[in-house]
């Protein structure tokens, strides 16, 4: 089989979308790719073979092996390299003989590519007309620069997440448990944790607004006594609520993970709470939270 395209009868994206950046593929497609490629077998090429075709070195591959989702990490790392594109990914999968992946995910990849093209066209149409000399003098904003560890420094491919985690530093241990339960298991969710994912040097209010509104599908609020004293958490919560009045979009999910001496915040009382302190429902806690964060 030629390495230039999928096998006959496969449902891979058409050539007009093959030059699109890897950022066109959403989390659903990436998770399904991981299901195919994370499994180590003797009969089919796995993610390590794909990494070698992408010119990753031995030590880089060994480092990727330490992650719960090595395929996802591989795609994140590769998409910032020269030549990375949807079309190139399909060529490599074909070269490795993974026609099963192309047949299964082809329609979904095509759909993602078409959505990406449509979004780019809409954004282009909405741009105001400006004189080039004036436009070039406008300083770049934080939204256009790299603000997270996996961002494109120029802002062309912003990193996106399933949920922004609003928390106080004193509650970081529970946040770390959340990472283990939601990112490093079969749920494979992608959380935005400021202390881990956000680069220093930019206004915290600007970063929070950008991430909550444009980069994260939902926001999880870790409620505690210390949370009630945090101006930063107060801003993040009120900002998220302003984006979804009445919680109609199920955008904000409060979590109570330990007993509180102070009264539960009134602005969150009308939203269903995930209560980690209730022993009767604790066994269902992570499943309920994961499903809530996975909703479209």
From Swiss-Prot:
One Gene Ontology molecular-function label: Toll-like receptor binding
A biological process from GO: toll-like receptor 8 signaling pathway
Subcellular location: Cytoplasm; Nucleus
Stored SUPFAM superfamilies: DEATH domain (SSF47986), Toll/Interleukin receptor TIR domain (SSF52200)
Keyword set, alphabetical order: Cytoplasm, Immunity, Inflammatory response, Innate immunity, Nucleus, Phosphoprotein, Ubl conjugation
Location of region: Intermediate domain: 110-155
Classification via SMART domains: DEATH, TIR
GO cellular component terms given for this protein: cytoplasm; nucleus; plasma membrane
Keyword Phosphoprotein in annotation: yes
Domain called TIR: residue spans: 159-293
Main location: cytoplasm
Transmembrane segments: none
Protein name stated in the entry: Myeloid differentiation primary response protein MyD88
